[in-house]
UniProtKB/Swiss-Prot annotation:
Belongs to the methyltransferase superfamily. RRP8 family. Its EC number is 2.1.1.-. The lineage of its organism: Eukaryota, Metazoa, Ecdysozoa, Arthropoda, Hexapoda. This is Ribosomal RNA-processing protein 8. One of its GO terms (molecular function) is methylated histone binding.
Amino acid sequence: MKPFEVPPWEEGADIIEFEPVNPSGNGVAAKKKPKKKKPKKKKAAVPNENLNVNKAAEKFTYRQGRGPLAPPQDSSDDDYEDVEDGIRAMHKVKSGRIEKQRPPTQATKGGKKELKLKPELAQAALEAMEATSSTTPAANSLASKLQSELLGGRFRYINEQLYSTTSRKAEALFRKDSSAFEAYHAGYRQQVEKWPINPLNRIIKTIKKIPKTAIIGDFGCGEGKLAQSVPNKVYSMDLVAARSDIIACNITDTPLQARTLDVAVYCLSLMGTDLNEFFLEANRVLKLHGTVYIAEIQSRFQDVREFVRCLNACGFDLNKKDVAVNYFYFFQFKKMRHVPKNTKMKAFSLKPCLYRKR
């Protein structure tokens, strides 16, 4: 290749000769010279690094598919399974899935565990067992429950008899079985505890507002709480006398003199199918314009107006009523005329109040 020379200006451009050059790539860039690769230098081995690797290998030996706690490769399968079972049990203990195994206790020849106690502790345990062997809380609870069920069952039976028979048959029932009265009132006390209010307390509050000279007759008094709660003279009457100051009699035929009472009280005592005889007796013993207080369970009244008409036939006019109170109705009647005891009239009653088994 001839070197590129610049011709003199006087010779002109015709004499300039160019040597063709083969283009590379797109014909624009000149052909590049290939670069020479430098040979890589080999790194020198570091003795300390090999030493650390050897120490780590000595400290931990690994088995394919196992963790750092796996047994070495040269160990037998039995040894490996024992170690694996121990690790698995350890994890179960930590996670709370199983309890820690307790060390086995020493057993006697018969296979039973032997418990060694000091003599004073053994004597104290023996005394405690003898003291509690006769009565235990569980036994007492069961006996109390059975006794309560028996009491409730007998109360329901007696209650049904009193509501579905006449007062004379109820009197015969209590005369035949003297313990029936106590059983009935024991069950009655249990029912009172379940009521939202005790209607007798309201009547007591009303009686305390009348003059202390007023004479009161408590018909079907039960345990005679009214006489103990007011300062007035009270004649407490029921089929069975729970106390010495209670008159045992049929409230349709009392021993009181005619026209001696100022107030007659019937608190949850309108039981039986002959209520007409109840109020004919009340008319006999009450003074003219005497007052009758009645408290009864709401569900027993099918028609309040019919009940008022029946008492009107017995000589009483309605003075006041409170049927808005939940669960109980309260009435106040006044005796307006005398009605002979032997007056014939249709018997009437209220719906029976039968307690269901709970």
